[in-house]
Amino acid sequence: MTMGWHTVMEFTPSLIGCVIASGNHSFELVRRSRECVINIPTTVLTDKVVGIGNISGAVVDKFEKFDLTSAPAQHVKAPLIADCFANLECKLADGRLIEKYNFFVFEVVKAYVARRPKYPETLHYTGDGVFMVSGKIISRRAQFKPEML
């Protein structure tokens, strides 16, 4: 499944919230297993990201169709996509909003990040088939007050 939207909800523990459409094949798989892997691609995988989002895993093996490399996860049953820049193994932390809003709250239990590139060109979906690419880095580290988070 290609995820169109997610949000960081907390840093300790690391919580991520996302909406998964109830008609999506992944919705029931994730709801039943109470776990998933969030794979973070770079622009190199743009066409594969779109293709993955346009077909259901109920009718095709997406790893095979899109020539993706799977890797075993340590804490969840779902595989990692080794082709991605980062992978987040997640377990359901709060399911109270699933029935009403299809909103899942996951705790990241293990994270993997490639050492290079230091600042990858990651994709950010803006809607209607349009993506924004990360790029320019702006630092305000000297002014940042982490205690205010």
Predicted regions and their residues:
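Basic, polyanion-binding surface patches
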Residues: 1-149
